[in-house]
Structures are given as structure tokens and as C-alpha cells.
């Protein structure tokens, strides 16, 4: 059943109908559309459009429909209705007859779909926040179990300074905490109800929109009807949140893919999140992580696509806005799936401490410690930096780590170097000295773990 037709003397071409219809994806808004319709029926009682008995009949029928949808949402796709609003109204009329035709009084699909989508976004944000915090918790637990796992930290994918696997985990906790904060901010801004704004100019019925917003669980009602039906900022914000969040997950995946590789060998992934090769029997491929990394691109594409859709639209509603849903649904589904999968990857990961330790001791990762030692002896840092660079060249020439160079060789580069230099070049010393807030010292890492556990109520 089309919700429009009196103006037309010819039926729509079937090809246009298929091109125009949105039920194949906006069926996901069925529950929100029904909930919004119940609230709207209550509002119509306050302005005398419906009697209390009529509203009761409508609400009962809508609640029955809601249970039917929850039991089998796929049934909606068997219909040839134009969109979810048409489907809900048609089903309601099937249940209550002519009374169902009164429900749309004073309401437009423009404010209706805007409300439905915001309700869906609010529910989905809560799911994302839960999954985000679950992954943060998994990272904190992994960090706590690996505080003593020393490994090389990298810049330019070159070994730079020693860190711990725990410190690496906590870096991603920080990223995820920012993702959490962005979602919470987005939720605050989208928590305003457009219902009652009509097609663009507002409703002709003196409905208390603040009361209506409260019935739907919104913090307040929107202030401008023209903006309300054309606003998709919340879609852009959520897509941006997802794009940034997926960048973080992609980096997480890339790190672990490298750590898991034969070249690094720092970790081994569980069999539960890896797959094999159809040809090479020895292979154990990090498919879960590669898919997380690969799915990042589709989320970035959804954000770019939506921005291009909106950039040239005049006020108010335009059918272009129908393009807001598929990209949003897919992007947030993808992000949610990847958050869950990242947590699963951490469940059962094995950190190979001896291999991590060996790698941390290679690559002259303690060179900065030698420079700091010279600074403590009164050598200006820039000069110390140059001296250590020369010492590293000599160590490479001899095929030795810095700490294995004889004192006489080290003193060729600076006479201030004494026997006390060797304890300073140990991995433990490298870690212990990074004791300022946010550093990699055992005390700072332990404090960061405790702080994260308190914030996450672990």
C-alpha cells in the first residue's frame, strides 16, 4: 500500500518502484517505527484526534505487531510495501481496520523516519559502548598478565626502545577510551526528538513535543522543524566515530599480524581465530586480524559517501537522504563485529616472552640510555647523541651489542664513560628510568592498569 497516490493518474513503473523502494534495508527500523507510532497515538489523544479508547486499540495492535516483528523480522521482506512506514501502517490497518488510517494525522514520513533513525542510533550506540568497554577490559586483563613481557618498541618499524607487552596493550586502551568518549558525545547531540515537525514546517496540531520526546526516551525535542527533518549530523558523527574507531582496530590488527609473523614471533594466536591453507599444510593464518584490517576501508568509504550525499542538498528533506541508512547500518555493524572479534583474538593469545626479550636486546634499543648516561655526566645532549651514534657504528662493526663493548672501546668516544655505564644499559634499567606519568616503568604500567580497572569497574 502506497501512502500517496491521489495526485497520480498512472501507476509507477515497476522499475522505478524497485529503484525507489527502501523496505529491503529500512525494515531494520521496524521496532523503532512501531514504538514511535505508539507515542504518536498518545499525542493525538491530547489534541482530540483520537479518543482514549481508540488510542488503546491502536496501542494494543501495535504492541502485538511489535512482538510479531521481534519473533520474525524477516517476514517484513516478503512484502512489496514501499518502506517500513508503509508496512507498519498497512499491518495496523489489517488489525484494526479504518481506525488505523487515523494514526498518520499530523505526521510526515520526514519526521517519522528521522525519529526512527535516531532511536535506532541510540540503541546501537549503547551496543557499541558495551562492546568497546569489553575490548578495553580484555586489553587491561592481557596487560596485567604480561607486565613482565619485555619487547622492542618501534618507530618507522625499526627497533627503537624497550617497552612491555602490557604497555602496548594499554596504548590501545587509551585509543578505545577516546572512541568511547566520542560515542558518548555523539549520543548527547542526537538525543533530541524530531517527531512532531511534520514534513518541514511543523505540525498543525498543538502537540506538546517535549512531552512526546520524553515518552520516547529523548532528552528533549528539537528546536527548528526545517532543520529537524533534514538533519543527518548524527549519521555523519557516528560514521566518523566508526571510521576513527576502525582505524584504531586496524592498527591493532596490523601490530598483531606483525607480532604473530615468523619474522617477529612475539605472539601466537589461538586456533579459534586463525585458518589454514588449502595447499600449504603448515600455514596458520591470522584471518581474523586481516579481516579487521580489511574491513576498515569499507567504513571509511561509508563516511566519505555520506558526506558527498549531503554536501549539496538544499533544505529540507530530499530523497537523497534515503541513502543515509545502508552505509550507516553496514558501518556500525562492521565496527561492532570487529570490536567483538578483537576481544576474541585476545582471548587465548600467547605472548612468547623469551623471543620478545631477545628481540628487545637487539637493534641497540638501549642507545638512548647511553646518551642519557652521558648527559648525567655533564655532556650536552646533542653532543651525547652524536657520541652514541659513533659508538653504535663501532658496535655494529664488531657485531656486538653496546653493553658488550669493552670499556676501553667506549672510552674512545668519551672519557667520561666509566664502569658504572654497564648497569645503565640493561633492559631493566631502560624500563625503570621511564618513570614519569605514562612511561613504561613497571610502577607506571601497574598504576595505569589499576587506573583503567577502576574506570572500567573491573
UniProtKB/Swiss-Prot annotation:
It is an enzyme of class 4 (lyase). Coiled coil: none annotated. GO terms for cellular component: cytosol. It comes from Salmonella heidelberg (strain SL476). This is Argininosuccinate lyase. Its EC number is 4.3.2.1. Its main location: cytoplasm. GO terms for biological process: arginine biosynthetic process via ornithine; L-arginine biosynthetic process. Pathway: Amino-acid biosynthesis; L-arginine biosynthesis; L-arginine from L-ornithine and carbamoyl phosphate: step 3/3. SUPFAM superfamilies: L-aspartase-like. InterPro entries: Arg_succ_lyase_C, Argininosuccinate_lyase, Fumarase/histidase_N, Fumarate_lyase_CS, Fumarate_lyase_fam, Fumarate_lyase_N, L-Aspartase-like.
